[in-house]
Amino acid sequence: MDPIELEQWLSAHPPALADVIRHVAAACARISRAAARAPLAGQLGGAGSLNSQGEPQQRLDVLADACVSQALSACTHVAGWVSEEHADVTVSPEHGSGGAYLVVFDPLDGSSNVETNVAIGSIFSVLPHLFRGTPASAAAFMQPGRRQVAAGYAIYGPSTVLVLSLGQGVHMFTLDPDAPGDAARWVLTRADVEVPVSTTEFAINASNQRFWEKPVQRYVAECLAGQSGPRGRDFNMRWVASLVAEVHRILTRGGVFLYPRDSREPFRPGRLRLLYEAAPMAWLMEQAGAAATTGTGPLLELVPDALHHKVPVILGSRDEVERIVTYHEDPSANVSWQLFKTRSLFIQPQA
């Protein structure tokens, strides 16, 4: 059987939406090439500027943002977009009122890993433009994740893979590095991805343990207690500091990812951006049979109150996510840790 290419696959979907995905995929292919050539082209290191969140930008952050923005500017169906790198909405100069769709994106997730050559990626989501006929505004983006019509990411690692859902399962396309010239040839390499329901892997930044809520403390301690603890089996812990890399591992072999609420800044409920990080990944998880929550409710039900609204994120294999939700529902059941004291890596919380 001949391989199925992205262009052929998109032909079965609404033409306008397919065209949006086509433009995003082209931008991802350009970013992939730029990332691969970054050490040779002098594109490593800081850009000497800050993004909309006040975070230092890498040179590749700026380049990736330009790649996606240029691609969306050329798409007649996109009214406007929001990028992690900019505080406000960018209205399409040509199609700001007539475009049927809005796009949100993180142009280069995990960019702090660039110089160590760890996998990085681009995350995107497509929303309907509910106020079509008027220029795209911030209010138009205040939609729950359930309204997404497409979401995905590209991961730039040993191979470049575009992971995509248009609401009918999750599919993976690999970029052909031998395609002639500047052509971007994406080939379907995995269709209808399903995340295993159970897992023995979890991913969390353990250095923040002292700030976690008790339900998360309990969950991690039980995992670390291993076979002799209440779970009766051993777990492995992972942490890459790249949301794309963490999610890709979960889609490939299962697992659970936690970036929970913590007490460092009580006025901020989480660390990941809802529109262009949490919601797209939650959409992919649910499309692949997994689950995604804040700990107290489904991520896809949340309506952002700002373009860069941040939330806690727990996603992955359904059994583990549901267990963590149960722990949040009854904090009084988060029992003493003395049972695990000799096995835990963590200092026991004081009463």
UniProtKB/Swiss-Prot annotation:
GO biological process annotation, one example: fructose 1,6-bisphosphate metabolic process
Leader sequence segment: none
Recorded catalytic activity of this chain's protein: beta-D-fructose 1,6-bisphosphate + H2O = beta-D-fructose 6-phosphate + phosphate
UniProt lineage: Bacteria, Pseudomonadati, Pseudomonadota, Betaproteobacteria, Burkholderiales
Residues reported in the UniProt entry to bind Mg(2+) 1: E84, D106, L108
PROSITE patterns, sorted: FBPASE
Record note on cofactor: Binds 2 magnesium ions per subunit.
Family statement: Belongs to the FBPase class 1 family.
Identification of the protein by name: Fructose-1,6-bisphosphatase class 1 1
Binding-site residues for Mg(2+) 2, renumbered to this chain: D106, D109, E277
